């Protein structure tokens, strides 16, 4: 009796395309980009008095898609530059470029395609100002921060945080064709939020960063100094989060949420400074994400209720 024939190699083919697509999708750092688009969307909504019209909702959708594409392009370019660093760090070793699953040429072409598509979408269907601001953000993150600042100085997060704080400005520009003071207040909040957010991560990932050779603050200045900086920045951030109410762009609903959320972040910062543990640093990092998401959600609720 003859043996059963071996399965044909072609049987694995249907899984190849989905696997390759998932690798390209991973390059865009989806969770990070989702937060970017969310913050940009909040900027869009706040820029429109009252309930948006159908045409304005359509404009928001197109602008969000364009910003998503360019943000994904910046993330993919970052994966090329930091391929060697990512391979040394447990947190990033899974990335397709770090594992050698995608070549630099493939990743660069993918990044260029996303950037070109997003820029064209923003230029022709939104407005040129939004396109140029979004492209400047791409350059700020992918080149100035990733290539120059990140390997050069422990203040990389502080200076480079400007590019990460741009999403609400992009959203505001998409709907109004200008950058108003309200957009700059939203920019300030994210700019002040960025250092304690990333330094909390760097504290419990310090060995990863030490192996990578990046001059993150816990590596260059030590654990205790970084913990103090996290706490001090949460205090400064508290003041910054009050600015929408002080300027008159929100009411007591946002104010109450800002006080509670910012006080919680300050408490985490204080506890981290006084009694450090990796577990607490991880909780502080996670709370920072909750803080920003709920803070901007409170702005949205406040905008429509009062």
From Swiss-Prot:
Pfam families attached to this UniProt entry: UbiA (PF01040)
Gene Ontology biological process terms in this record: heme O biosynthetic process
Subcellular location, record wording: Cell inner membrane
Membrane topology term: Multi-pass membrane protein
PROSITE patterns: UBIA
Gene3D superfamilies: UbiA prenyltransferase
Record's keyword annotation contains Cell membrane: yes
Biological or metabolic pathway of the protein: Porphyrin-containing compound metabolism; heme O biosynthesis; heme O from protoheme: step 1/1
GO molecular function annotations of the record: protoheme IX farnesyltransferase activity
EC number per UniProt: 2.5.1.141
Catalysed reaction equations from the record: heme b + (2E,6E)-farnesyl diphosphate + H2O = Fe(II)-heme o + diphosphate
Keyword Transmembrane helix found: yes
One cellular-component annotation, GO: plasma membrane
Transmembrane feature ranges: 32-52, 57-77, 108-128, 129-149, 157-177, 183-203, 230-250, 252-272, 285-305
UniProtKB keywords: Cell inner membrane, Cell membrane, Heme biosynthesis, Membrane, Transferase, Transmembrane, Transmembrane helix
InterPro entries: Protohaem_IX_farnesylTrfase, UbiA_prenyltransferase, UbiA_prenylTrfase_CS, UbiA_sf
Its job: Converts heme B (protoheme IX) to heme O by substitution of the vinyl group on carbon 2 of heme B porphyrin ring with a hydroxyethyl farnesyl side group.
Note: Carbon 2 of the heme B porphyrin ring is defined according to the Fischer nomenclature.
Entry-linked HAMAP family: CyoE_CtaB
The family this protein is said to belong to: Belongs to the UbiA prenyltransferase family. Protoheme IX farnesyltransferase subfamily.
NCBIfam families assigned: cyoE_ctaB, PRK04375.1-2
Protein name: Protoheme IX farnesyltransferase
Organism of this sequence: Acidovorax ebreus (strain TPSY) (Diaphorobacter sp. (strain TPSY))
């Amino acid at each position: 009796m003859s043996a059963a024939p071996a399965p044909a190699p072609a049987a694995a083919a249907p899984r190849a395309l989905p696997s390759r697509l998932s690798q390209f999708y991973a390059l865009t750092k989806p969770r990070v980009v989702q937060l970017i688009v969310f913050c940009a969307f909040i900027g869009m909504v706040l820029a429109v008095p009252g309930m948006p019209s159908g045409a304005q909702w359509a404009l928001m959708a197109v602008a969000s898609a364009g910003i998503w594409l360019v943000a994904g392009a910046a993330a993919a370019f970052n994966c090329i530059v930091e391929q060697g660093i990512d391979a040394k760090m447990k947190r990033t070793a899974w990335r397709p470029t770090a594992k050698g699953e995608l070549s630099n040429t493939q990743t660069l072409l993918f990044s260029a395609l996303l950037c070109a598509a997003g820029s064209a979408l923003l230029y022709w269907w939104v407005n040129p100002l939004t396109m140029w601001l979004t492209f400047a953000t791409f350059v700020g993150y992918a080149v100035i921060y990733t290539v120059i600042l990140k390997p050069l100085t422990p203040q990389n997060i502080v200076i480079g945080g400007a590019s990460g704080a741009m999403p609400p400005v992009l959203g505001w520009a998409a709907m109004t064709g200008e950058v108003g003071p309200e957009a700059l207040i939203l920019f300030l909040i994210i700019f002040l939020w960025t250092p304690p957010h990333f330094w909390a991560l760097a504290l419990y990932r310090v060995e990863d960063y030490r192996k990578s050779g990046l001059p993150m603050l816990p590596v260059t200045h030590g654990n205790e100094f970084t913990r103090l900086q996290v706490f001090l920045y949460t205090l400064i951030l508290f003041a910054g989060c009050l600015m929408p109410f002080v300027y008159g762009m929100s009411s007591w609903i946002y104010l109450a949420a800002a006080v509670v959320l910012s006080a919680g972040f300050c408490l985490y910062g204080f506890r981290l400074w006084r009694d450090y543990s990796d577990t607490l640093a991880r909780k502080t990092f996670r709370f920072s994400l909750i803080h920003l998401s709920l803070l901007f959600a409170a702005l949205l609720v406040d905008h429509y209720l009062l």
